[in-house]
Design a protein with these regions (language model features):
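Structural secondary-structure packing elements that flank or coincide with functional cores
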Residues: 3-83, 145-226
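Long, amphipathic alpha-helical coiled-coil segments characteristic
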Residues: 60-110, 213-257
Length: 273
């Protein structure tokens, strides 16, 4: 998804959004220094830009996920009874997703996870089976509160129903973009003190999605501070450190300036943070 990041940088520059440009530059500076930072952390700025340019498509955090989508064969869970497409199944899924979209219904999310796992067990085509396994993993994550329950996860849940409708009519094509979005949320899940649910664990393992630290795509992580103030703060800290070292070495002439320098550092932190 490198082209998405380039697009973000160009849009920010064209629209003359200083905070956005600062965020992109700060992110790129960290990458060049070898810091482990996800481009998804630029999502708040990216979303603002997309809103300003009047994009017809909703901004999605997975737009910035640096993954090129490829289908992997994710086997169905062992011991899960196969479930066939049927009007009664669609009615069950409609009700469950509606409750999920209303928020806070972990039982309905788990029901969707179970039904999706059953659909996966009934598929003979690898992509269809993998899709339903990813859907099962996605709903397991919602059921256990392993990633945010927000407008993006709710939209994804409703899109699963549209994909079901298409596949139940005999259309074997599966949306790459929907699978990518669902897998993105699966990548956010961290087990904490408990064990990862089965479908989610399998999807994370096969796609290599497990992470060591959480990712907050709604929280601004870059461009929060004025670069000029940050530079001034660094200079003041360096000057205060030099004075302190001199005092420790017995240079009492620095006593007159040490209080002023530390006060300046304190002021910098007040305005910067």
């Amino acid at each position: 998804m490198v082209h998405h990041r380039i697009q973000v940088a160009r849009l920010l520059e064209r629209l003359d959004l200083p905070a956005g440009r600062t965020a992109v530059l700060e992110y790129l500076e960290g990458v060049l220094k070898g810091k482990q930072a996800s481009s998804v952390a630029l999502f708040p700025q990216y979303r603002s830009v997309m809103d300003l340019v009047g994009s017809d498509e909703h901004a999605h955090p997975a737009d910035l996920w640096p993954i090129e989508w490829r289908w992997q064969d994710v086997p169905a869970l062992e011991g899960v009874a196969a479930v066939e497409y049927s009007p009664s199944l669609r009615a069950q899924m409609d009700q469950a997703v509606l409750r999920v979209m209303r928020g806070g219904d972990s039982a309905s999310a788990q029901r969707m996870a179970d039904l999706s796992a059953g659909l996966a067990a009934n598929q003979t085509q690898p992509e269809a089976r993998t899709f339903w396994m990813i859907a099962s993993a996605f709903f397991e994550g919602i059921a256990q509160g392993l990633f945010p329950e927000d407008v993006y996860t709710k939209r994804a849940a409703s899109r699963v129903l549209r994909q079901y409708a298409s596949m139940s009519r005999g259309d074997g094509s599966v949306s790459d973009r929907l699978a990518l979005d669902l897998a993105f949320f699966c990548s956010l899940a961290m087990p904490g003190g408990g064990q990862m649910p089965p479908a989610l664990q399998r999807v994370q393992t096969i796609y290599g999605l497990a992470r060591s630290k959480p990712l907050q795509y709604e929280t601004e992580q870059f461009g929060r501070f004025d670069p000029a103030l940050m530079a001034a703060t660094r200079k003041r800290i360096a000057a205060a450190a030099e004075t302190w070292s001199a005092l420790a070495g017995g240079d009492t002439n620095r006593l007159k300036v040490v209080a002023e320098q530390f006060a300046a550092v304190a002021d910098s932190f007040q305005f910067t943070f």
